[in-house]
Every structure is written in C-alpha cells, then in structure tokens.
C-alpha cells in the first residue's frame, strides 16, 4: 500500500504489443529522487483490476515481455547513464498456486525469473544488484551513484519503507 507521499509520480507510460499473443502491455515507469525508476507492467486487458500486476495471461511468453521492459530501461539508461531501477515482482495469486509445489518463502515465481534474467543480462560493472526476497523487490543500483555516495542501499531501503509503508530489508546479490 502506498503512503500519501506526493513525491511518487508516474513519469511515462509505454506500450508494446506481443508478437505471439498480440496482446498489448502497459509499462509504467515511476520516477523517484536520485535518478531511481520503478518499473511495472501488466496486460492492458486487466488494467482496471486491483490484481493487474499478479494476473497471469497463460500465454507462456514471459521472456519476450521482460525483454520489452528491459528495452524501456535501456532507453532511460541511454538518456542518463546514472539511472537505477527497481521493481516488485507481484505475488502469485492463490488460484495460480493450487496444486503446485512452490516455495513461496524464497520469493514468487516471477521474482525468481526476473532475478535470473537481470543477473544474466546486466553485469556488476554497471549495476549493483540487491533484493528483498520476502517482499519480492529487486533493485539494480547504478554503480557510479553508489561509488560517489549519491545514493546508498540504506537510502533506498528507507525510501521504500516510507513510500510503501513496509519493513523492507535489502540484501546484496553479489
């Protein structure tokens, strides 16, 4: 749940269409201080649902969808090489977990998938990767920002706790 903090704002809405399912997806990019951007996406067909970030389309094309989100991230990075990114991997809905042997304590299936993709696609030279597996938050913090002290893990953790009224603890992925 978000706090009443008005520093959170949606900077851009991006759209793309899947070449496989032909479904249109919306990517929301939220801007925070210190060049930090939160990335969210969902299928346009469920945009009014409170569960829009958790709903599965069962089209089995997550890699294509995530690659499209990464293209959005890269566009921000090309414009400003000091940007950092974060996202929350939405929890699986109860109906999607029925009958499946899934360890929800180590993060959602989405979280594990996103984590694997980010570690494989982005090296440690550019982004310091950290996470909170309990709350399925994944961060890619710009190394230049960290090394100059412009941002710290503690700053980001505090901001997450303030904005989303939570108790987030960021663990380093290195």
PLM features: residue spans?
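Non-catalytic substrate-recognition and accessory regions of acyl/acetyltransferase enzymes
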Residues: 1-174
């Amino acid at each position: 749940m978000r706090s009443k903090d008005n520093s959170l704002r949606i900077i851009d809405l991006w759209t793309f269409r899947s070449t496989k399912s032909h479904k249109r997806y919306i990517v929301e990019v939220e801007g925070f201080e210190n060049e930090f951007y939160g990335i969210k996406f969902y299928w346009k067909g469920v945009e009014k649902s409170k569960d829009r970030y958790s709903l599965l389309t069962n089209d089995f094309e997550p890699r294509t969808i995530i690659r499209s989100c990464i293209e959005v991230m890269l566009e921000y990075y090309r414009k400003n090489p000091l940007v950092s990114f974060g996202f929350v991997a939405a929890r699986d809905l109860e109906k999607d977990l029925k009958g499946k042997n899934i360890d929800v304590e180590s993060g959602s299936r989405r979280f594990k998938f996103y984590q694997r993709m980010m570690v494989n696609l982005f090296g440690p030279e550019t982004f310091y990767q950290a996470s909170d597996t309990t709350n399925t938050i994944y961060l890619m913090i710009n190394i230049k920002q960290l090394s100059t002290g412009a941002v710290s893990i503690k700053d980001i953790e505090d901001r997450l706790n303030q904005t989303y009224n939570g108790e987030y603890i960021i663990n380093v992925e290195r």
